Design a protein with these regions (language model features):
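Conserved aromatic-histidine-acidic binding/catalytic patches
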Residues: 17-21, 65, 136-140
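A residue-level signal for conserved active-site and pocket-lining positions in enzyme catalytic cores
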Residues: 1, 29-30, 113, 148
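Residue-level signal for well-ordered alpha-helical scaffold segments within enzymatic catalytic domains
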Residues: 8, 31, 35, 79, ...
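Nuclease catalytic cores
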Residues: 2-41, 94-95
């Protein structure tokens, strides 16, 4: 529905979106990472944010599919939070893209992070916090970066590196 798309993509109405353990944790992690890149947060904000969200999820009885998945996710994200270093350079966060396919259909969304490289190219980054993104599946999900690149090309970007 057009109104739901408007609420999601223009108003950023999170109440309009299905809430599950991955959307909640991923959303807050993305927010802190964006804040770090924009100078509004620090690396030290990551782990407390995740711990607070895990406590709230437990209180609300919103659970991971299994305890072993939860334990693995917590271990992986704790390691990430303790080792993450803010990127250096010129960046754009949450860049809107609109891609018109050859058959006339449109895809739209927001790119988590674009790095503007010294040589005039850009690199596209997309944060993934779900345990779904591993092994061979990561290649399939990496196609998302190709769609982002196509959208940026249509927007006028000339040299794009997908990462």
């Amino acid at each position: 529905c057009l109104y739901e798309a408007y609420r999601t993509y223009v108003l950023h109405d999170k109440a309009n979106q299905l809430q599950n353990v991955y959307s909640i944790l991923g959303g807050s992690t993305h927010d802190v990472l964006e804040g770090i890149t924009n100078g509004e947060a620090t690396e030290e904000d990551l782990l407390p944010t995740i711990q607070k969200d895990l406590d709230e999820l437990q209180m609300l009885d919103i659970n991971f599919p299994s305890d072993s998945i939860r334990d693995g996710w917590v271990a992986d994200m704790t390691h990430f939070c303790k080792t993450y270093k803010a990127p250096k350079g010129k960046f754009t966060t949450e860049e809107f893209f609109l891609y018109k396919s050859p058959n006339g259909n449109y895809l739209q969304g927001y790119i988590d992070l674009i790095k503007h490289n010294a040589d005039g190219t850009v690199s596209i980054y997309d944060y993934k916090t779900s345990s779904m993104y591993k092994g061979e599946d990561i290649k399939k999900h990496g196609r998302q970066l190709i769609v982002y690149a196509l959208g940026l090309e249509q927007k006028g970007y000339k040299e794009i590196l997908c990462i």
